[in-house]
Amino acid sequence: MIRKAFVMQVNPDAHEEYQRRHNPIWPELEAVLKSHGAHNYAIYLDKARNLLFATVEIESEERWNAVASTDVCQRWWKYMTDVMPANPDNSPVSSELQEVFYLP
């Protein structure tokens, strides 16, 4: 399993709405994530900095990257553009983090 972590931003006035939209996420999005090998996906909110910290375990980079081209992911990204900064393709602005420590 490959562990990944990344950060995103959420708009200051959208914390509650961001949480509402994720509880629960769309069933079809959950199915796509799972079918593409995502496990133990979690997102944490730092309200003071409007920061989202996400972790996920994936089976392969290729399958994880393929999620972005699915119709449901494209619709989800568009749905989320009013609550967080987005790239021109509507994907959330994010930065991948480098793992520096792991205790199994």
UniProtKB/Swiss-Prot annotation:
Domain of life per record: Bacteria
GO molecular function: L-rhamnose mutarotase activity
An example Gene Ontology biological process: rhamnose catabolic process
Keywords noted in UniProt: Carbohydrate metabolism, Cytoplasm, Isomerase, Rhamnose metabolism
Pfam family, one: rhaM
Subunit text: Homodimer.
GO cellular component assignments: cytoplasm
Organism annotation: Escherichia coli O139:H28 (strain E24377A / ETEC)
Gene from which the chain derives: rhaM
Annotated family: Belongs to the rhamnose mutarotase family.
Purpose of the protein: Involved in the anomeric conversion of L-rhamnose.
EC number: 5.1.3.32
Binding site for substrate: 18, 41, 76-77
Name of the protein described by the UniProt record: L-rhamnose mutarotase
Database matches in NCBIfam families: YiiL_rotase (TIGR02625)
Catalytic reaction annotation: alpha-L-rhamnose = beta-L-rhamnose
Pathway assignment: Carbohydrate metabolism; L-rhamnose metabolism
Residues annotated as catalytic: 22 (proton donor)
UniProt-annotated location(s): Cytoplasm
